[in-house]
Structure formats: structure tokens, C-alpha cells
Amino acid sequence: MVNRWRGDVALVVNGQRRVARLTLGALAELEDALEEPSLVALVERFEGHRFSSRDVLLLLAAGLRAGGTEVSAETLAQAEIEGGPVAASQAAAALLARAFVVPV
């Protein structure tokens, strides 16, 4: 079940609905993989539209792993994501946004 307050985002991969979320560990993994020095730099990279399709794959793969699905960016690159690249980019943006939302 998707819990937006926990930062969950639903994504359909190869016909199966998956839940992704960005935990602190997933964010640290992304900083390392994308060679960004901080969380702020990571977010600014995406907010400033300076990201690549590889960045989206790395973000989604980290989020899916944190949500309980073991997948690499390389495997995800070969998978069918429902909605294609647009849906993948939207899911990546939602993951980042929800990771920093404070529940009220």
C-alpha cells in the first residue's frame, strides 16, 4: 500500500505495481552514485533540470530497493515502466519531493 506521508510512490514495472521511497540510506546511496556532496546539491541537480536519464534510473532503483524491490539501475533500464520515460521522470520527481515533505 502506498503511504504518501512516508514518501511512497507507486510505479508499475513489468506489469507489477511496486512501491518506491527514499530512505536516508537511499539518499546517501544517490549522493555517492551521482557524486553529489550533499542532499542540497542532489535536490538542486534535479530542481535545476540538470539530470540525465541515468540519474532518473539511479533514483528510481534506489527508491525501489528502499521500498523492498531488489533491482539495479541496469535491470531497470531494460524493464518496461508503465507510462514510459515521462512516468519514470514524474515518479522520480515525486520521490524527491515526498522525501522532504513534513507531515502536518
Where are each of the predicted segments found?
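Generic recognition of short, well-ordered alpha-helical interface segments
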Residues: 22-25, 51-55
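Short, surface-exposed, low-complexity cationic segments
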Residues: 24-41
